[in-house]
């Protein structure tokens, strides 16, 4: 590494830690804002934990946001913008993206360490239901336009690829689309998995829109 690079990296991390607020409150009562608060508080908790510092305030703030998100989870598995509202594919996709980001960065471990292994069980169950909701929405009404609150194929595949552990019901998808359209879908999946030069998987991310 170039001379001074290590010191520079340490300084940046120190700056991040010093800039941490006590906790982050959601900017609004909507699920998108709550998911952001959950994410930021657990990110802060992760930074604190790496230094051996207390994280309970951050974890409690994150779980407060989780509780409000769960209140907006519907029987069909999707999340509405607010509690009592109809499920939205866009809102649900954002929740799934952010949860996957926390999982990938191993920030969910902070919650388990602080509150116990079962602390996120309810949210884990809601996430699995949300993935199945995304499947049902996309294959239940594939002609529903994006502007009507649905998501594009690329956005669906981006989110779905984060949850390969949730079984995909190929038979149901084939039945919903028909043989011809399902074959087209498979071609699109292949094109997504093997992007052309200059393209990236993240091009379909909901949060990048």
Role assignments for model-derived ranges:
Residues 199-200:
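Short strand->helix junction
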Residues 1-172, 179-189, 193, 204, ...:
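Extended, solvent-exposed functional surface patches
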């Amino acid at each position: 590494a170039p001379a001074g690079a290590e010191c520079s990296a340490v300084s940046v991390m120190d700056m991040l830690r010093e800039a941490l607020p006590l906790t982050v409150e959601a900017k609004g009562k909507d699920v998108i804002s709550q998911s952001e608060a959950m994410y930021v508080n657990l990110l802060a908790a992760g930074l604190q934990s790496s230094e051996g510092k207390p994280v309970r305030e951050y974890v409690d703030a994150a779980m407060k946001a989780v509780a409000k998100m769960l209140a907006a989870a519907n029987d069909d598995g999707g999340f509405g913008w607010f509690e009592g509202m109809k499920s939205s594919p866009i809102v649900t996709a954002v929740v799934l993206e952010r949860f996957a980001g926390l999982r990938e960065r191993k920030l969910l471990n902070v919650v388990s360490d602080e509150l116990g292994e079962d602390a996120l069980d309810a949210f884990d169950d809601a996430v699995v239901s949300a993935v199945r909701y995304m499947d049902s929405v996309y294959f239940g009404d594939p002609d529903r336009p994006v502007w009507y609150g649905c998501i594009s194929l690329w956005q669906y595949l981006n989110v779905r690829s984060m949850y390969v552990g949730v079984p995909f019901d190929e038979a149901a998808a084939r039945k919903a689309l028909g043989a011809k359209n399902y074959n087209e879908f498979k071609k699109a999946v292949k094109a997504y998995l093997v992007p052309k030069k200059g393209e990236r998987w993240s091009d379909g991310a909901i949060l990048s829109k």
